[in-house]
């Protein structure tokens, strides 16, 4: 991928799924964030975003992604899974783990799925407790020390 690209699902989901994506290669040594946006039940947009202090442009990279139906349930082996969307900014936001995950300290995946403002951001997990996890969107600081950021939509996957 290079620039903004549209990803279409082979078949539409019943509702907008949780989308999780990453850059899978290192063809260009310059650090880059993968931004996901415009998620619908039919697909989403991706774009690589370089550090603020870097020169524009980035080499072609391979992107990996997975889309998981929003909601929750139990797998055949008894594992609890929860996929949902939340809204998070640069202030630590506690998010409840939900029934079946309390006290289990689950596996957590997350992805920022909006682009609000032009600064590169990443989703961070902090303060895992028996009943909640703290989420925060952090800006990188290559050009300036300011890290305040507006609310972004995030997809979250929890599984025990």
Report each predicted region and the residues it spans.
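Extracellular receptor-binding modules and their adjoining Ser/Thr/Gly/Asp/Asn-rich linkers
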Residues: 1-160
């Amino acid at each position: 991928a290079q620039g903004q690209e549209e990803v279409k699902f082979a078949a539409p989901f019943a509702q907008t799924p949780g989308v999780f994506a990453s850059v899978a290669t290192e063809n260009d040594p310059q650090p880059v964030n993968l931004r996901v946006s415009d998620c619908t039940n039919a697909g989403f947009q991706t774009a690589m975003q370089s550090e603020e202090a870097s020169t524009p442009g980035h080499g072609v990279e391979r992107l990996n992604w997975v889309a998981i139906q929003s909601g929750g349930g139990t797998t055949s082996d008894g594992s609890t899974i929860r996929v949902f969307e939340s809204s998070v900014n640069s202030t630590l936001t506690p998010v409840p783990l939900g029934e079946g995950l309390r006290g289990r300290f689950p596996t957590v995946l997350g992805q920022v799925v909006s682009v609000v403002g032009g600064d590169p951001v990443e989703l961070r997990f902090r303060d895992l407790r028996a009943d909640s996890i703290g989420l925060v969107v952090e800006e990188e600081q290559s050009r300036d020390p300011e890290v305040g950021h507006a609310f972004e939509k995030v997809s979250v996957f929890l599984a025990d």
